[in-house]
Amino acid sequence: MSESWFALSRADQAEALEVAAGRTGRPAHLLEKDIWVVWALSAIYGSPLAEKLTFKGGTSLSKVYKIIDRFSEDVDLTYDIRELVPDLLQGGHPIPVSASQEKKITSAVRTRLPEWIAGWVKPVLEGSLVSSNAQAEFRVDGKDREKLIIDYRAVKTGTGYAEASIQLEFGARATGEPNSRHMVHCDIAPVIEGVKFPVAAPLVMVAERTFWEKATAAHVYSLQGRLRGERYSRHWYDLAAMAKTGHAAQAAGDHQLARAVAEHKSVFFAEKDANGSKVNYHKAVTGGLQLVPAGAALAALESDYTAMLEDGLLALHQPSFAEIMEKCLAIQDEVNHKARDGQ
């Protein structure tokens, strides 16, 4: 019978991670971190929370769809807006019909979501920690206390760019749809026998919606030129990877999905460009998408991408930053062309 990963001694864990690193080419500290990512998903989706949360973002692209070949440590989860604030939705419709309704919903989400995280998610993880015989601590973070951080006792360490923690970031201003159920396994599992690793079955947002989420985020950055934390260059890396797998082209042809993302972001994530003008998301998805920034904004992205490479967050033989930008420019042209043809 296989022994649980968390039942192994730290020495045995370290040895297994080193062996796996040699066999996979991935840094040992990231293989360890990946175990905790899957553990967190396993705890959440093995609980009553499973039907109310949608797993999305870059981690879903790597762990579920195998589109990107980079380590993604942040777990983005959408708690269905219809579950959190049903009393504020007109006819159950998730998009507000007025600015005043949006303000009421946003205010309620900022109050209720942290309460839900503390009252429901944290206890689920704490219970799973005990039953797994794992060692970690939890803390709430974020401006609106919408993040739950799992600080684990690391066996292996890297350069420090990737810390020994997992960030669960929750949002509750969308439905998380469209989505479907998928299995998720630890990267180390296929190369280490005789050990039982965490396994999860999350409800996952479709990759095409993730494309539009990332494309509109890149569009906003290109107009603003303001870097939002470390690893922000991951969005452009992911977009370029989605072009190779055909997901970008498929998303570009889904005009209804593009408009849905634009409508949602226009209401809940209004932004202003560098000149103070309101960012027009609808223009972005109807022929005016801009994915490649210029000047200092481009240089900041390149520095961030270099840091990702240095800590091994990306697998070997990755494209250069210039190649990624070239691919994103091609995506931009294709998306805009299809959008204009589809009008």
Locations of regions flagged by a protein language model:
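Structured mid-to-C-terminal alpha-helical surface segments
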Residues: M1-L53, Y65-R70, V75, I81-Q343
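Short gly/ser-rich loop at a beta-strand->alpha-helix junction or flexible surface loop bordering the NTP-binding
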Residues: L53-S60
